[in-house]
Amino acid sequence: MKQNVFEVLMYLFENYLYNDEEPGDRDSLESELHEAGFSAMEIRKAFEWLDALADSRVLPAAPSGKSSIRLFGEPELARLDTETRGFILYLEQVGILTAESRELVLDRILALDDHEVDLDTVKWVILMVLFNRPGEEEAYNWMENLMFDVPTHLVH
């Protein structure tokens, strides 16, 4: 039996959100997830995670200065290694993440019950957050290209 909230989120994202397939009602989705092998507790946590992400769409944007520096707290340091923290800050520096979307990404990462989160998981959380935020289509497309484009090799 699968026991990871992130796996439930990935299943939903790949089968419904990312493929533009219309999901059924919540009860039918829960039944499908049970049939796919997910536990009731993980399904509930995944829906809570998605509800919190959806609720964040209505929060007003807070002004942020370009010269501000983000210091990570203990819970973030415990779950994110140097590479993942650097990647998040890099995306903010190049304009893919705003200060608001960065904070939402960090909030959603901490909401996963995983002890330590790897770079691939962080990339998927970023993609899910950008997908959910109105006006972030360009950033979403950039992030999607970063994740899925395979570089071509030149042959001489």
Curated annotation (Swiss-Prot):
Coiled coil: none annotated. It holds the Pfam family DUF494. It comes from the Bacteria. InterPro entries: Smg. PANTHER family: PROTEIN SMG. Belongs to the Smg family. This is Protein Smg homolog. The gene is smg.
